[in-house]
Amino acid sequence: MDFYKYQAAGNDFVLVTSMEGRADIAADEVIRLCDRRYGIGADGLIILEGSRDYDFAMRFFNNDGSGGMMCGNGGRCIVDLAGRTGIPASGKDGSWIFEAPDGIHRGRIVSSQGRRSTVILSMNDITSVEPIEMPETDGQDSKAWRMNTGTDHLVIFRDDLDSLDVLKEGRRWRYDSRFAPKGVNVNFVQYSGQEEALRVRTYEKGVEYETLSCGTGIIASAVAAWMKGDRREKYTLRSTSDTFSVSFSHRSGIFSNVELTGPTELVFQATL
């Protein structure tokens, strides 16, 4: 099996291609390949497959074998791989149009140098943002925000991001009974004020640890800032490892024209 190892702001993936048809892969095989001691090592595995109606299809799995959700960083990596492997782009602006578990996406390579690229990815509309009442504690807002940006996210604003125990606090809210049975990804955001970059740390379910970045979490954090009253044309957000930009439109309670821009890198390719 040929595979490609990618990272997007430290969020790393194993990518495989199967343009001839749907690839069968069991959850235990995903777990084995993503294991950092006995496998290749990754936060998730992505399959680039052929599509009857679009340029290609994307399937994503967390490193615990769970699937059926979208991954923003993985979506940007798969767009870069489509470009490197010569898959034609059908969009008039040079973008690839592809199907994913949550619907149809467009992705375009903005720039590329060697193994590194900057990729912009369109995401689906966000139709519901739910305010969640939180216990009043030092350093934490009394209101958090829950939404689905391709997968389920909770955004909590804090003013102590550097000292925060993300593993402990992330697990606490990921398994909170209000979000059972599936749980949520948990993003902790430090907000400095208008025009300042938002800082984000994410506890990712499926990985069950703090990831260096999470694309759908970055989007959720920007939307939560908008809900908090910070209205911008474009948001700059810094994860533990890199910087992203997010833009969207808002009308009648719906966030549309959602776009995520950030870095990708082809680390290596090999045969297993």
Report each predicted region and the residues it spans:
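A glycine-rich beta-to-alpha transition motif near the start of alpha/beta enzyme domains, typified by
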Residues: 1-115, 155-272
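Intrinsically disordered, low-complexity regions enriched in acidic/Ser/Thr/Pro/Gln residues
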Residues: 119-121
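C-terminal domain-closing interface element
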Residues: 127-131, 135-140, 145-146, 256-272
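Internal active-site segments that recognize and position negatively charged phosphoryl groups
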Residues: 136-163
